[in-house]
A protein has these predicted regions:
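Helical element adjacent to the flavin cofactor pocket in flavoenzyme catalytic cores
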Residues: 213-264
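N-terminal Rossmann-like FAD-binding beta1-loop-alpha1 element of flavoenzymes
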Residues: 3-29
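Mid-domain catalytic core of redox enzymes
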Residues: 255-369
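C-terminal segments that line or cap access tunnels to active or ligand-binding sites in enzymes
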Residues: 319-428
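Glycine-rich FAD pyrophosphate-binding loop
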Residues: 22-45
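A glycine-rich dinucleotide-binding beta-alpha-beta segment and adjacent secondary-structure elements
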Residues: 186-200, 352-356, 410-472
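Rossmann-like flavin
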Residues: 92-207
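N-terminal FAD cofactor-binding segment of flavoenzymes
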Residues: 43, 50-85
């Protein structure tokens, strides 16, 4: 059995530590923050509780799988399936609830969006699209989500070979927007399904059409909510790791990954050197090379790839109750293409942003005092390249409040009694995410999946990677899968 050091206690690092410890390895996790979770943490202020990071929970079986690793009984992890994925709002007064039940969804679409002039109704277009999304998932998930793209034998499996005969249906030659525009007659539905590019911080007008795999997770499989909030994912996995004997060092920064020849030797901290047979970096791949492997050859093409979008998040304790809203809510921009041009071409904020509002107190009542709600309010932002955020954030706040007033008919200004803010510079500072990018690199390239850093070093023996900046990508499910891929690579090495 080997001595393994994991750098970073984000969700992928925790999952990797559990899987490797369950194989009998000695595992030490080193984390610069004062606790586990990375972006998936919580904060409390004046009787309000906020999940600070990822707010959408899909594929809960991936969490349950991690919590079943090792020779202990599976850990308890209560969660519920939701009857809807999101409430959508447009400024013209259109409101749409995306029900999980397909019959209710079809009825809602035809009632709220209306009947189009073609032979098919809008709901038929959506249901056909969701079947296509399921098709994409069935034929591409095995390779793009569950296997290393950087090992030749991954391409020799039966599911992958089978997928090659269907590749002409993957919309690889179209952008996500082009694929959706060809499928839907109504521009609101195009916009709704274009939104899924933002799930990995990308631009739907440039990202490949194969990203239409994403709606399958939300609409066909379903959306879920942990009974104790999203931070319960971190807490449960962390407690499982400790129970299995994983060791942790918090408030500890790594100075460098020590290499001799082409073999990893361990990790140097401020005060000591810790030897290891293997090192796993759950840190962002950019600072891993620039800060921890300064004397080693870096994969410059990967490191110079376009970063994903970042975010500005306002955590608001709000007085009052808002029945129109649910757990997940989207207020769409009237200029969606302009919003993405500003983000990716201009490195700027758009004056009419799409606003995402997450309110966990809708389901977890003790997240806010009686008569109040906890609002997690997010807009997409460009990655940090030195913009004047101190100037931009007050402008963004005002744009968001104006958007809420125009779309929901509510002036929130005198109802906000608690406020905290997260911006790209703070994201970068707290999580070492390069430029504050939420998902590492964007998918604004038809070959983006193949340009992500692999889960292993191609030059250094004993060095592995997991987390949102490497294959298969960002977000809770893909981070958990990166840990699974890494575990299989180490086991089969």
């Amino acid at each position: 059995m080997k001595k393994i050091i994991v750098i970073g206690a984000g969700i992928a690092g925790l999952a990797a530590a559990i899987r490797l410890r369950a194989k009998g390895h000695d595992v030490l996790v080193i984390e610069q923050a004062n606790g586990p979770g990375g972006k998936l943490r919580e904060a409390k202020q004046d009787q309000f509780r906020f999940d600070l990071g990822p707010s959408l929970f899909t594929l809960p079986e991936l969490v349950k799988e991690v919590l079943s690793e090792g020779n202990l009984s599976p850990s308890s992890f209560p969660y519920e399936q939701l009857d809807r994925s999101c409430h959508y709002f447009w400024e013209d007064g259109t409101e749409l609830i995306a029900y999980h039940d397909k019959d209710k969804l079809a009825e809602e679409i035809d009632k709220k969006i209306g009947i189009n002039a073609s032979d098919k109704t809008n709901s038929e277009d959506v249901l056909t699209h969701l079947k296509h999304s399921a098709f994409l998932y069935d034929y591409t998930a095995e390779l793009f989500m569950h296997r290393s793209l950087h090992k030749f034998k991954s391409y020799l499996s039966k599911p992958v070979l089978k997928a090659l005969f269907k590749v002409h249906r993957f919309d690889l030659g179209k952008s996500l927007h082009e694929a959706n525009k060809a499928r839907f007659k109504d521009p609101k539905l195009v916009q709704l399904f274009d939104r899924y590019a933002t799930y990995n911080g990308s631009d739907p007008y440039r990202a490949p059409g194969v990203l239409n795999i994403i709606p399958h997770l939300e609409h066909n499989i379903g959306t879920f909510f942990p009974k104790e909030g999203m931070y319960q994912i971190t807490k449960s996995i962390y407690e499982r790791a400790k129970a299995l004997g994983v060791e942790f060092k918090f408030n500890t920064s790594c100075k460098q990954i020590v290499v001799k020849g082409n073999q990893v030797q361990g990790v140097e901290l401020d005060t000591e050197f810790i030897p290891a047979d293997l090192v796993v970096s759950n840190a962002d791949v950019f600072p891993t090379y620039r800060n921890l492997l300064k004397n080693q050859k870096a994969p410059e093409k990967t490191l110079q790839s376009e970063p994903s979008s970042s975010a500005i998040i306002f955590y608001w304790g709000v007085k009052g109750s808002f029945p129109k809203l649910h757990l997940h809510n989207i207020l769409f921009s009237d200029d969606y293409q302009g919003e993405f041009k500003a983000l990716f071409d201009g490195d700027q904020l758009h004056p009419d942003p799409t606003v995402y509002i997450n309110i966990t107190s809708k389901l977890k009542k003790d997240d806010a005092p009686k008569g109040h709600e906890n609002w997690f309010v997010m807009i997409n932002a460009p990655a940090n390249s030195g913009q004047d955020w101190d100037k931009w954030i007050p402008q963004a706040r005002e744009n968001i409040l104006n958007k809420i007033q125009r779309t929901l008919g509510t002036d929130l200004r005198d109802k906000i009694i608690v406020e905290d803010i997260l911006d790209p510079t703070l994201i970068e500072k707290r999580t070492s995410s390069h430029m504050g990018a939420l998902y590492g690199t964007s998918s604004n390239n038809r070959m983006a999946a193949f340009l992500r850093h692999p889960n292993f070093s191609q030059n250094l023996k004993g060095l592995y990677f997991c987390g949102g900046s490497v294959h298969p990508g960002g977000g809770i499910p893909l981070c958990l899968l990166s840990a699974k891929i890494l575990d299989e690579l180490i086991t089969n090495a």
